[in-house]
Amino acid sequence: MMKLYNTLTNKLEDFVPIEQNKVKMYVCGPTVYNYIHIGNARPIIVFDVLARIFKYKGYTLQYVQNFTDIDDKIIKKANEEGKTCDEISEKYIEAFLEDIKEMNVIPEIIRPRVTENLDEIKKLINNLLKKGYAYKKGEDVIFSINKYKDYGKLSNQDLNSLTNGVRIEVDEKKDNPNDFVLWKGRKANEPYYESDFGLGRPGWHIECSAMIHKYLGNNIDIHAGGQDLIFPHHENERAQSNCGYDVNNEFVNYWLHNSYITINSEKMSKSLGNFKLLRDILKSYNGNVIRHFILTCHYRKNLNFSTEDLEVSKKTLEKISKSMSTFKMLNKGKEDEALEDILKEFKTNFILALEDDINTPKALACVSILIKKVNKLLATKESNVERVYFEIKDKMENILGIKLNEDKIENDKNKILEILLNIREKLRQQKNYELADKIREELAILGIDISDKK
């Protein structure tokens, strides 16, 4: 059974979906005012693996990841460049989709935009006003955290001692400094929209709650994102949705959060200026290498970025490809009985690792162990091990999303054949016809026929 670490309960829990054989999952997407950095890519890759696990296990998956396409940062960028917010957001949405395609992210993801869901956002704000959880100050609409007794539970904070989060807006209009804005009244030189409560635009937190409700319903199985979103963003989402919709106790059953990618033990972020753009890294390393690098560390642990570790991932994938090249060629004759046990153990341990809170480093270790065991088997006897090639290919590509270099595998095969043919020709020149004929016979078994010139 799948076990996931739930931030809400601070413990590892068995995963039980709301509906049998169906998973509804939402992952917070980017605010599209810049290219994404590799720290932004971590939740995209980690939760892509989770989605792949569910698909592999036969679940019907509904997966939503949003675009925040109206925001203070987008407005600032548009004003700086003399462009519209739509032009800025469109540019970086297109860039985002290009980047994640290079990272082999599954395409079956619903990607709504905030500006396409304003009616749903307004409905939720009206619900919160009617129920008394929100109040108006001028053209602003603000959520009152004191009205929701469970506020702070997700981030494990007490109402009386809340820490101001990075994106909490301190405003004299608020009854409580930690109250948060649902609707921002119109300001000069900013886009605005009409609503029952005045001209303005949505606040950051309300967007995700509304889009989750529209595309996935009142209750969902999994909500995921980076740990920096726990407070205030996800705390506020939880408050809005639990108060504004008719949910069954909690609108999210499992809250999952990945840890940071760091540089010199410091969190990578655009605000600190210590980030590495994903598309810049892609100029030197392909998406499979970057993906492998991210998956070598458990998602709830900090991962330090370094080109040295990217090189390790690159060489590791090259070694796996070379082994697969060998296994693919050894496809004649019978399989050794021991191979069945080796493969059975691999398949069991690989899936168990991923069911243990998405333990990707352990799953990758299972691949290395399999290769070592098969090579050890081949050192003692000849055996048909082509099935190992297909088993590794299946697990690496379909579950971990790491595509192995098929061209390299085919090139290695051709190089080995060329070496054998050169050796055979030298044997014939030395009149060692017995050994030369033996090589020809063995190649014929592999389906490669050689005709000697007379």
Each language-model region and where it sits:
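Alpha-helix C-terminal capping/helix-coil junction sites
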Residues: 55, 101, 129-130, 256, ...
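Short, glycine/charge-rich beta-strand/loop segments that flank catalytic centers
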Residues: 67-71, 93-96, 106-121, 139-148
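Active-site pocket-lining segments that scaffold enzyme catalytic pockets across diverse folds
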Residues: 96, 101, 106, 125, ...
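The substrate-binding groove and active-site-proximal loops of carbohydrate-active enzymes
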Residues: 79-85, 109-115, 198
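N-terminal, positively charged nucleic-acid-binding surface of large information/translation enzymes
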Residues: 9-12, 18-104, 450
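Short, well-structured beta-strand/strand-turn elements
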Residues: 60-62, 132-138, 449-451
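Alpha-helical recognition segments enriched in aromatics with Gly/Pro capping
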Residues: 1-33, 48, 120-327
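Structural preference for alpha-helix termini/caps and helix-kink/transition segments
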Residues: 267-270, 275-454
